Swiss-Prot record:
Protein name (record): Cytidine deaminase
Taxonomic source organism: Shewanella sp. (strain MR-4)
Entry EC no(s): 3.5.4.5
Catalytic activities: cytidine + H2O + H(+) = uridine + NH4(+); 2'-deoxycytidine + H2O + H(+) = 2'-deoxyuridine + NH4(+)
Gene: cdd
Keywords: Hydrolase, Metal-binding, Zinc
Keyword Zinc among UniProt keywords: yes
Domain CMP/dCMP-type deaminase stretches: 47-167, 186-296
Cofactor(s) the record lists: Zn(2+)
Length: 296
């Protein structure tokens, strides 16, 4: 079991903890598939709703909040039945807008894993307005059921009435619908190719600034992040922040980053290079490789 879970595992009922420990191996990064979840429910003799709420301390253990020191965990349950944990991330010494909220982390985890719809969001603190707006960008966002400890469950539409969303800006295919944009680039570099693929899957209906970041660690492992825009603009999730959240969930340190690549479209209304460099330089003393590509 990873050291970061030692404290949180003691907060779980013993039958659930005993069943969960084998899953918390060195490669565990917050994903539990539908079959594993069913086995946890059976072994613990708890309901699924009780298990998901009980797992929140495990999700919160993925957090990295050096500024607030407030650990928030979130669990997104997909239509597939799989669950995806996420946690808040803050960049030391940097402006607060670089922060990743736990709900954003969990949703990006699900998106990068190929999930097509979120049906439940379990979180240990009431979602802030920023996160409510971010969730509203998703497929059937208003119908996502929000679960909080010691509170009744409600749909997102209860927490965000009279919502402003993608349809107000004539966007009919929201976040989590598979979007593919093709770009022209001749490269044999696997890391650049990976970034190009993820840029093509990014979500930028308001600026067409399709973009992705890939980080490589000293052992050659890679961690990606895609741009995810929002109808309200400010809650958009930048690809570097998503990549750093991804890396953190995998229990890697920022000091292990040895290479960073940003690929973005030449036809976008904005460029993400400045914000991407700011975030990177807050955590790693390396230069950003910036590649601009033309849509096919």
């Amino acid at each position: 079991m990873q050291d970061r879970f030692i404290r949180s595992i003691t907060q779980l009922p013993t039958p659930l903890a005993d069943a969960l420990i084998p899953l918390l191996h060195q490669n565990f990064a917050g994903h539990i598939d539908a079959q594993q979840l069913a086995e946890l429910v059976q072994s613990s003799k708890m309901t699924e709703a009780e298990v998901l709420l009980a797992l929140l301390p495990i999700a919160a253990a993925l957090a990295k909040p050096p500024i607030s020191e407030f650990y928030v965990g979130a669990i997104a349950k997909g239509k597939s039945g799989d669950i995806y944990m996420g946690a808040n991330l803050e960049l030391p010494g940097e402006a607060l807008f670089h922060s990743v909220h736990a709900e954003q982390s969990a949703i990006s985890h699900a998106w990068l894993s190929g999930e097509s719809q979120i049906v439940d969001m379990i979180v240990n603190a009431s979602p802030c307005g920023h996160c409510r707006q971010f969730m509203n960008e998703l497929v059937e966002g208003g119908q996502i059921k929000i679960h909080l400890p010691s509170q009744d469950s409600h749909l997102l539409s209860y927490y965000l009435p009279y919502a402003f969303g993608p349809k107000d800006l004539n966007v009919q295919s929201p976040l989590l619908v598979k979007h593919e944009t093709e770009f022209a680039l001749d490269s044999s570099d696997p890391m650049v190719i990976e970034a190009l693929d993820h840029a093509g899957l990014s979500y930028a209906p308001y600026t067409q600034s399709y973009a992705a970041v890939v980080l490589e660690t000293s052992d050659g492992a890679t961690y990606c992040g895609r741009y995810a825009e929002n109808a309200a603009f400010n809650p958009s999730m930048l690809p570097m922040q998503m990549a750093l959240s991804n890396l953190t969930r995998h229990n890697r340190d920022f000091g292990e980053i040895r290479r960073a690549v940003l690929v973005e479209s030449s036809q976008g209304k904005i460029s993400l290079v400045g914000a991407t460099m700011d975030a990177l330089h807050a955590v790693a003393a390396i230069e950003l490789e910036h590649i601009v590509v033309d849509p096919v």
